[in-house]
Amino acid sequence: MIGRIYGTGSYVPNRIVDNNELSKYVDTNDTWIRERTGIARRHVIEEETTSFMAVQAAKKALLQSEVKPEEIDLILVATSSSETIFPCTACIVQSEIGAVHAVGYDINAACTGFVLAFQTAQAYIDARIYKTALVIGADSMTNLVDWTDRSTCILFGDGAGAVLLRAEEGKPCLMAAHSDGTKANALTGMSRHHKAVTSLEDKITYVHMDGQAVFKFAVRKVPEIIEELLADASLGVEEIDYFILHQANKRIIEAVAKRLRLDLTKFPMNLEEYANTSGASIPILLDEMKRNQRFQRGDKVVLAGFGAGLSWAACMFEW
Ligand code: UT7
């Protein structure tokens, strides 16, 4: 069984902060940010919350799929920046959309979260436990970054994306995933009110990242996991139509394409507009591509996420 994508939706805040505006807050400039990351601007929450954005994206996915909220069995929200620790964001979404028969929970795996949530939903569907699943990625990273740290605050934006999956007979989704907790310190985030009592306090408050370590990890592990995933199905990378990677940095995506010896046109990007929206980046891009009718039935699509944990995951399905 496969969970076929029946509908997608996304939401980004109206407030746009471009690189020039950022240069008023920290010592940076548009040229540096564009050259090192490919980012030109980001959408930043004002009154919005993570759950508000998740609900808006979910409503659009529902509308597009023509599925009734009461038909949904499962709601998964990939987020590491929910405004409440509990209740989980998925239960807030359930209430707001009226998905009265669904069970909902959040998956916190930072930028890898959406791919892991998508895999979880696919596994439930393939096991015939649930038929209809709503998978959302939603994050308000600008709430967690230190706006005085130029090495991290320039990278992130806010948003949410959702996909509505329905069970159909078909080739199951291929999946691979890994974590390496020994490298956890390369990318950490604490809530704003966290009172750390260790000597590392200053370093681990807000988002703290060893940018180069994360960059090297991504460039090595993403091609590796894609090859691992496809080898299991005896597929070559050239048979894949689209590689939809977590939108962290244009140079990471270019390096992955180069390592796989593939044309960059197979690697759609929208990070210039939204920056790194963590768990939301892949579903926002999926929604944009679907609305622009970029997918044909039968297209082979790879999703790949990577980030804090450190963790990385990939999956492949036919559209
Ligand atoms: O979702 C997954 C999460 N994270 C990532 O994917 C991030 C992965 N890493 C990266 O994308 C890159 O490492 C960064 C974009 C964060 C940094 O790029 P880099 O090419 O690794 O730069 P760097 O850290 O080596 O810094 C080069 C220089 C330094 O100055 P010096 O020491 O050479 O004088 C930095 O202080 O650039 C300086 N710098 C900046 N300059 C202007 C660092 N941040 C900025 C800035 N504006 N915002």
Enumerate the language-model features and the residues they cover.
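Buried hydrophobic positions in well-ordered alpha/beta secondary-structure cores of metabolic enzymes
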Residues: 5-7, 33, 61, 75, ...
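Flexible, glycine-rich active-site loops centered on histidine and acidic residues
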Residues: 126-160
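Acidic, glycine-rich active-site loops and adjacent beta-strand->loop/helix elements
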Residues: 11, 78-83, 109-112, 137-142, ...
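Conserved catalytic cysteine-centered active-site region
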Residues: 34-36, 40-52, 79-133, 258-285
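A contiguous, well-structured pocket-lining segment that forms one wall/lid of small-molecule binding clefts
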Residues: 202-271
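Conserved beta-ketoacyl condensing-enzyme motif
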Residues: 5-7, 47-108, 229-230, 235-253, ...
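Condensing-enzyme catalytic core mediating Claisen C-C bond formation in acyl metabolism
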Residues: 1-47, 149-216, 220, 224, ...
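Catalytic phosphate/nucleotide-handling subdomain of diverse soluble enzymes
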Residues: 287-304, 316-319
